[in-house]
UniProtKB/Swiss-Prot annotation:
Name recorded for this polypeptide: Krueppel-like factor 2
Region called Interaction with WWP1, residue ranges: 110-267
Biological classification of the source: Eukaryota, Metazoa, Chordata, Craniata, Vertebrata
Organism: Mus musculus
Coiled coil: none
Subcellular localization(s) per the UniProt record: Nucleus
GO CC terms of this entry: chromatin; nucleus
Amino acid sequence: MALSEPILPSFATFASPCERGLQERWPRNEPEAGGTDEDLNNVLDFILSMGLDGLGAENPPEPPPQPPPPAFYYPEPGAPPPYSIPAASLGTELLRPDLDPPQGPALHGRFLLAPPGRLVKAEPPEVDGGGYGCAPGLAHGPRGLKLEGAPGATGACMRGPAGRPPPPPDTPPLSPDGPLRIPASGPRNPFPPPFGPGPSFGGPGPALHYGPPAPGAFGLFEDAAAAAAALGLAPPATRGLLTPPSSPLELLEAKPKRGRRSWPRKRAATHTCSYTNCGKTYTKSSHLKAHLRTHTGEKPYHCNWEGCGWKFARSDELTRHYRKHTGHRPFQCHLCDRAFSRSDHLALHMKRHM
C-alpha cells in the first residue's frame, strides 16, 4: 500500500536514554492524544517551511548559543529542571528568541552591564581622598562609571571614630622665634578635585561647592600680627614679613654701587716741621725728612757720572739728573714724536695739542 506523504522518523528518537529516565522520574501531565497530534502537525509544517527536509535522528538540531549568565545570578531553588517531551522542546527551541533580555544591570570588573535603552558612559577614575571624608567612589556609584538617565546612588561617608570631623591641618610656625599657630580664616579644601563637573545629559548632577580661597601671604602675616597683639605676645620678627617688590622705574634708575670709593680718603697731615717760622705738615714721614734737609742743607745723593759732582737732597731729583747724561726720555707723546725725560714737561706739552 503506497503512502501519499513521506514517512519521517519518530520524534521520540530525538530523546536520549538519559532524558527518558529523567522524564520517568519527574511526574508530568500527559497531554491529550488529539492535542499532541495537532501540535506535531504544526511543528512538521514549520520544519518543512524552513527547509529542514534532511533532518535525521543522527543529527539533532543544535540550540543557538546562549549569552553568559549575568554576574551574581543564582537559579531559584526548588524549581524542577526544564525537561519536557521532545516535540515540545524542539518547538520551544525553534520559536524561542535568539537572545534573552538581560535580567538587570550587572557589574563585570570595571564595567556595568545595563539593559537596552540606558546609556553607560565611562569616565576616568577619581582620586581617592584620605581616611576621612566621603569616598568619591562610594558617593557616585561604581568608580569610573557614570549611568545616564538614572539618579546616582549616594554612598555612605566614611568618618572618623564616634562621628568626629577630621582635625584641621596645623600651619607651620611663622618664624623660628615664636612657634605661634594661627588657624586658617576660612575652610580650605585639602584635596582639589582632579576633574571639573562635566555636562550632564540626564538629570541634574550633584552640585559641587568649593570653599573660599586661602588668604594670600600678606593677609596671613597681617592676621598673625593682629592675633599676636590680641594675645599680648610680641609680634613676629620683621624678617618674616614679605614686602612687594619695588617698581621697575626705581630698578632702572638705581645704579650699581662700586666696590671701591669714588674718591680717596683724605689722610690727616700728622707730620709737622719743627723749625721756627715753618709750619708745613706732611702725611708721610719720608716727605718730612726730605723737607728738613732743605733747612739743614744736607744732600746725601751724589751723581757718580764722570766729571759731574752734583749732589741732591732727594733721590727722585738724582734720577731726573742722571737722565741728562744718558739721554733717556721715557715720557712719549702719543700725538706726535716728541719725548721728555720728566712727566711735568710732558703735561705742559699736551696742553699745546688741546
